[in-house]
Amino acid sequence: LAGQLEGSKEVAKQFMERYNIPTAKHETFTKDNIDQSDAFLVIMNPPYVLKADGLAAGKGVLIIDNLQNAKDELRSMILDKKFGDSSSKVVIEEFLDGIELSCFVLTDGNNYKTLPFAKDYKKIGEGDTGLNTGGMGAISPVHFLDNKFLGKIEDRIIKPTIHGIKKENMEYMGVVFIGLIK
């Protein structure tokens, strides 16, 4: 089950909701409810974030400014399997504007240790523009992290995540990756 937190965005979102871990507003769509996706997109503000539910080598996220293009891309992802089986289910998510960073937490399922944070550079273009790649690089330490922000991350995200893993008997030992927006 712990692997599903990484392998399925829908499972991860449900986990976050169960443990009151902050996450963007979202809804999941498949070929069975794709007709309802248009109404959800209309109430969202652009840009529209479409995420393949499964693993897609870091390339399964589309950020689209135009409503019609978002509708078309969603259908391409689900019906045409743009990202293979990974996009048979797509999470439409509220766009969060800010700086993306990565948190790595070592855990034995009961205790944890946070490793240094890193600032990701995923985009193919100069100045972090263009499509996502499988990973262009990351820089650590992150200069904009202060003790107040680190405390919020620990109290609102890390502790509830480790608590949830333990409470749901996931028996996980290893690294928990947490992607954040500041």
Say what each PLM segment does.
Residues 1-39, 47-49, 55:
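Conserved N-proximal alpha/beta basic substrate-recognition cap immediately N-terminal to
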Residues 61-182:
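Internal nucleotide-binding/catalytic subdomain
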Residues 40-41, 53, 81-82:
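Short secondary-structure boundary/capping segments
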Residues 12-17, 43-44, 67-69, 109:
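Short, hinge-like loop/turn segments at secondary-structure boundaries
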Residues 7-11, 43, 130-135:
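Short hydrophobic/aromatic-rich motifs at helix boundaries and adjacent loops
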Residues 45-66:
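Conserved anion/nucleotide-ligand pocket segment
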Residues 39-40, 73:
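CheY-like receiver
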